[in-house]
UniProtKB/Swiss-Prot annotation:
The lineage of its organism: Eukaryota, Metazoa, Ecdysozoa, Arthropoda, Myriapoda. It comes from Scolopendra morsitans (Tanzanian blue ringleg centipede). One of its GO terms (cellular component) is extracellular region. The keyword Disulfide bond applies. This is U-scoloptoxin(04)-Sm2a. Contains 2 disulfide bonds. Residues 1-19 form the signal peptide. One of its GO terms (molecular function) is toxin activity.
Amino acid sequence: MKAIYILSVLLLMMLPILSRFATSEGAAQHVEPIQKIRVEQNDCTRGIRCPRGHYCDPGLRQCLPR
């Protein structure tokens, strides 16, 4: 009986940590910095040249075909 009580207390202590990873909001927080890095690497306004026949759109920060 004492073991069940200890396990239930441990589970209640771990619940906020586990729920942070279970929600989509928490998962999005972990993925978001990776997406920001990719946008910055492909950002043509920071010195990356666009291929021939493309132009740099400063609003989208991407190379677009002409």
